[in-house]
């Protein structure tokens, strides 16, 4: 909650200004391109059914029309992605410019930079202005766009998947059960389990990333100190002492790096398994209906696509976990 309050404190002057309508228009355009690309994805899911049914029926006459239709969908989706990315970069730079000017004024106004140098708080203001602000603007916009894309994708495909799931009847321990939309529940259960495991595996990443930024900044500050005081270091023959300080700070980076890479190794192992298992889950889930001939081959392919989209939506936290951790680490530094 404290992190969210700090982020809102940083974002409010830019997004809450009366003259920021251009930025809101940019954001609305980005969302518009995102929503239209989702609409095209729904069209492609319907195309999957027609294409694979025609393929299973060896219907060569339908293929040219279907291929041209698919190329049209792809052209529209690519256009949406490219335009959305271009507008996103413009918006990120506008926000970065606003934050940079604001932080520079706060840092230099009233000789505050001198007083901060004496007290040592906060650490490395140069990094906060030059790097952290850009990372904050970029990661915030990227995550927001990803979240909107996820909500739209879920809203578009959950109804399709529910309808394709039909009504399933099964018996367990002598009791009969009826399940509607069972593929939706399979996607939810798989994503919930994956999200819990992702959090358990990567829960230390945030603190390690924050610590990494501090240690990297301390090392850069020590290097700058040697450069700025090169004459004194040479005159007093302090090269050995400075070398010792630099090595000490670099050893702190190395210690953090070891712990961070160990944590990332566990996270990446989980992620690699998660991605590959996710490919087979929709096939396995729809296989009984296909073998029972309640689904055509085209239905199975459309179900596979819809299942993947819904499962992606449920698993947004898992997919975005590392980006969320990196965003939290960056948002915790400026202030």
Give the predicted meaning of each segment:
Residues 29-32, 36, 76, 80, ...:
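A hydrophobic transmembrane-helix motif
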Residues 206, 217, 234-238, 244, ...:
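Cytosolic ends of transmembrane helices, especially the final helix of ABC transmembrane type-1 domains
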Residues 204, 208-261:
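Loop segments that connect adjacent transmembrane helices in multi-pass transporters
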Residues 7, 44-48, 84, 103, ...:
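Hydrophobic/aromatic residues in alpha-helical transmembrane segments
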Residues 1-41, 46, 50-70, 84-88, ...:
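Membrane-integrated ABC transporters
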Residues 47-54, 86-94, 98, 102, ...:
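Membrane-spanning helices that line or support transport/gating and their immediate boundary helices
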């Amino acid at each position: 909650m404290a992190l969210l309050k700090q982020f809102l404190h940083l974002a409010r002057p830019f997004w809450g200004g009366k003259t920021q309508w251009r930025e809101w228009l940019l954001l609305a355009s980005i969302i518009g391109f995102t929503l239209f690309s989702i609409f095209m994805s729904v069209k492609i899911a319907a195309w999957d059914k027609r294409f694979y049914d025609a393929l299973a029926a060896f219907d060569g006459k339908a293929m040219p029309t279907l291929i041209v239709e698919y190329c049209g969908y792809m052209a529209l989706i690519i256009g949406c992605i490219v335009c959305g990315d271009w507008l996103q970069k413009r918006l990120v730079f506008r926000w970065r410019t606003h934050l940079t000017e604001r932080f520079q004024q706060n840092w230099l106004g009233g000789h505050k930079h001198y007083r901060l140098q004496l007290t040592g708080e906060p650490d490395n203001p140069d990094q906060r202005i030059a790097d952290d602000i850009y990372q904050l603007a970029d990661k915030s916009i990227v995550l927001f766009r990803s979240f909107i894309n996820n909500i739209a994708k879920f809203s578009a495909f959950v109804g399709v998947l529910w309808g394709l799931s039909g009504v399933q009847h099964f018996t367990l321990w002598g009791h009969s059960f009826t399940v509607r939309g069972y593929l939706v529940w399979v996607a939810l259960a798989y994503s919930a389990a994956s999200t819990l495991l992702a959090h358990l595996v990567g829960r230390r990443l945030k603190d390690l990333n924050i610590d990494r930024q501090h240690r990297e900044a301390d090392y850069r500050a020590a290097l700058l100190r040697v450069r700025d005081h090169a004459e004194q270091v040479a005159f007093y023959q302090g090269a050995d002492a400075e070398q010792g300080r630099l090595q000490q700070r670099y050893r702190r980076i190395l210690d953090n790096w070891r712990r961070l890479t160990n944590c990332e190794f566990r996270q990446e192992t989980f992620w690699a398994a998660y991605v590959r298992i996710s490919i087979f889950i929709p096939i396995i889930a729809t296989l009984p209906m296909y073998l029972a001939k309640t689904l055509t081959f085209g239905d199975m392919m459309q179900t596979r696509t819809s299942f993947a989209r819904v499962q992606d939506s449920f698993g947004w936290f898992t997919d975005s976990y590392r980006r969320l951790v990196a965003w939290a680490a960056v948002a915790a530094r400026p202030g």
